[in-house]
Amino acid sequence: MYYNLANECDIKLAHLRGRIGTEQNTLRPGGHSKGENDMKRTKKVIALALVLVMAAALLSGCGETGSAGTAASGKTYNLVYQCAWGSGGGPYQYASDLSKAIVEASGGRVTMECLATNSIVPTTDMLQAVSNGTLDCAQTAATNLSDDSLGILSTLPVGMTFDEYMGWYVAGEGQQILDEVMAEIDSNVVAFPCGVVDSEILYHSTTPITCLDDIKGLKIRGVSDWANIETRLGASVVTMDGGDCYEALSRGTIDAAEYSSPSANWAAGFQEVAPYLTVPGVHQSCAVYLFLINRGVWESMDEQTQNIIKLACTAMMAQNWAEDRVANGQAWEQFKELEAQGKLTIYRMPDEDIAKIQQVADEYYAEKCQSNPLFAKIYESQQAYIQSVGNWSEAASY
C-alpha cells in the first residue's frame, strides 16, 4: 500500500510540476516578469498547492484500490465562484488565491475563477445563491449574511483576535459550531473558514471623529453587531454594501464609514474622499472569511477533492493574515505620508472611550444571548475557548 501511495502521489506531483513549468513560462516570456509581486504570489500559491495535494492524498488514502469515493474518481468540477470583494484590493486577491490553490492542487479536476462582488448576485444574496445553485461556491464574511446571529462567526467588536479565531476553528469546536449553525439556517450549504484579514481602520470620515461624542448624530456605515453597538453609542447607522462606501462618502450620503484593513482601504481610495481617519479598529480586530459551497456539489466530490478544498481553506487563513499584515504596514506608511503632507488627519480614539465601547458591547451581548439562542451558542463557545487558553496567554505575554 505504501508503494502505491508514493507512486500515485509522484505521478500527481509530476503532473503539477508540468503545469507549473507551463505557467511560469507564460508569466515570464523572454525571461521578464509582468510584475514581481504577481510572480511571488504565484510561486506561493503553487508551493501551497503542492503541499495540499500531498496532504490530501495522505488523508484520503491516495493509492488504495477498491475504495469508492476515496481516491480521485476522475470526475471534473467546473465551479461558479463569486466573492464579496471588489477586484483590486487585498481581500479579492486572497479569494482569488484560494481558487488558484484549489485548481492547482486538484491537478485540474477542479476549475474555478474568482468573480468579484455583484458579478452574478449581490453580496447579501450570496448564501441563498449558493443554496439554490445559482453559485456553486462563494467567499464572504459572516457579517454579510442576512441572519443577525452570524456575524460573530467572522468577527465580534472588541472580541476575539486572529489567533483566537484561528485556534477556535482549527483546534477548538469552531468548525463543529459552524456545521451546526449552517445546518440550522440553510442545510443546503456547507461552510469552512477560508481566510482572514488583519485589524481594520475604525473610520474614514468627512468630519473629524476624535472621540465617541463626535459620532453622535453622524450618518455612519455599519454592519452586523457593530451597527447595533454604534446605534447605542449615538450614531445614525446606515447599512450599505462595502462597495458603495466610496461613492456614499463622496456624495455626502454618509459622514463616515468602516470598511476594511489599511491595504484594502487604500486600494479603495477612501483617502481621496475622506480627509479624516480614526483608529484603532475596535469594531473588528480581524475578519474571518467563509467558503460556502452547495451541499449537492460538495457531496458529489470524491474525498480527495474535498480534502484539498478543506486544506486550502485552512492554509489560506494563515497565509492571508501574514500577507495582510505586511500589506497593511506598507499602506499605513502611505496614510502617514499623506498626514505629513497635510492631506489627511489621523486620530486615535481615547482609551476611556474604548473602555466605554467595551462596556456597551458587553451589555449588548448579554441581552442578545438572552433573546437569540443561536448567537448565544456561538458566543458561549468562543468565550469558553478564550477562557481555556487565557491563563497561559496572560502568563506568556510580556
List PLM regions with ranges.
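A gly/proline- and charged-residue-enriched helix-loop-helix capping module
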Residues: D163-V181
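N-terminal secretory/targeting leader peptides
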Residues: G35, G63-Y165, E184, V189-Y398
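Short, low-complexity disordered leader/linker segments with a strong preference
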Residues: M1-N78, S393-Y398
